């Protein structure tokens, strides 16, 4: 084309949304009259390209040609003007920032002045694919007044935090239970966090998940007992791995002893398998032998130092500047303390040197002998200065100790040395006491729990950063040459509970503003063990109209012996016994053998016996030889009641 063959013109294609604008930039030294309008070739090429890209957009051609005409009169100027681009470019949708995480710092791990997390760090160690592991996180209010807070769940799809019945205002001393679940998809290291937004300080609870071998159940002490010389005794212990990942182990002899040996000293624990380690003892002498061994199992190591970039994490310049200034202030304070200590030691040395210094001169004798230049150096080493005897003194006089001018410098040096040692001992004791008090405060805060203390000390990477920690693995922001590693705790069954995967519809999210509606409907379902009542056969009449068998069941009335009623007892006051005046109501004899039927409930032990009820009547006394009418009136049981004369 003529447009492409002209070396003084360049064609720029600017694609904006759905339109293609042909921009022509004139770069030449032609006069303004010659550069006033583009040629027909340029306008034809622009129209052809525009029509090919958008055939139905011919209505906007005049606007484009006017734009090309106006912009072509300016050298080195892009055609797409601001008004035209604003009309064509689609506005980006606005995103509402989360006020709980935007420009918020979550750096306090474990506890703050208001809230305390139990445990401070959640570890899911030694997991299996396809299972869901859950732990309970308790957030306690340790302040004297109530508080409100927001719980921000983990951001990765592998962790889930639910709180079905969250309290609005948490009273002092009360706890909020949060169920944290973890569902892995592969064997690797997972990291996330649960963030708690509170009034003054925000709380961070890290979540770690990693494949690791089980906690070694090696005993802390193995006693072989009394063993004869030359005899070998073996003790076997097991290293187990519940996850399908192999782990290397090595047993190191911290305090070796030739009487002990461990086989195998190193090896691999297979996935979902176990390895037996034998410890042999063969005494070589009649003494108590002792050895110390240490078992090291290769696990997952996490970085101890993190390098965060502002672009990926979203660090604020103010936070970075504040951290740098705080670090500089701490370094300056440490340097000032070192300079102060050095200055004190220098002043002390100068004072001691000034005390030993002697100015030699020709002053008149003041009753004490002047020292020479070599004598102060000897005094510093503890030498004894013995003054010379004065002129005219007799040798038979008292010793040097009786001379008032005599000063034993070795005693002074010894006392000064003891005093300095005592002062140093007192100062060291005070410092150790302060450190011990701080350690006791930390242990009391952790409840003297070894597991919590290990969790606090196992991951110092989470205790130093002041940034808003994202929900991604920290290894993403690391440089290998600037990282040192530290192992995580081993697998323990008591740390979490295992249950099968649950449908996602049963979860309740924290951002659900609507009232909670049950997703499960209720209906009566037969158990399958007992058939319904409609399937049973009809009940016979013998079961519908059964006599009351409530007082006695047995063969008391089954034999031919006659039982006489108990004699009445009279009180000293001449009244009749009330218990003798009543008797139970007696029914006719019910013979179950005669009316036996299916499901009638008949009992053969009641054959020939009367059916007794729980109702009572007034006793009717019969004569010694009753008649048939009297017998029928008494009940027809054959029991004779007599009254003594």
Curated annotation (Swiss-Prot):
Keyword Cytoplasm part of the UniProt annotation: yes
Region (Interaction with calmodulin): 428-435
Pfam family name, one: Ig_CFAP65_4th
One of the protein's GO biological processes: cilium movement
Subcellular localization, as worded in the UniProt entry: Cytoplasm, Cytoskeleton, Cilium axoneme; Cytoplasm
Alphabetical list of Gene3D superfamilies matching this protein: Immunoglobulins
Keywords per UniProt: Calmodulin-binding, Cell projection, Cilium, Cilium biogenesis/degradation, Cytoplasm, Cytoskeleton
One annotated Gene Ontology cellular component of this protein: axonemal central apparatus
Annotated region (Disordered), positions in chain: 381-408
Any one GO molecular function term: calmodulin binding
Highest taxon, organism lineage: Eukaryota
InterPro entries, alphabetized: CFAP221, Ig-like_fold
Oligomeric and partner information: Interacts with calmodulin; calcium-dependent. Part of the PDCP1 complex composed of CFAP46, CFAP54, CFAP74 and CFAP221; the PDCP1 complex binds calmodulin.
Its job: May play a role in cilium morphogenesis.
Family under the similarity heading: Belongs to the PCDP1 family.
Name of this protein: Cilia- and flagella-associated protein 221 homolog
Species in which this protein is naturally found: Chlamydomonas reinhardtii
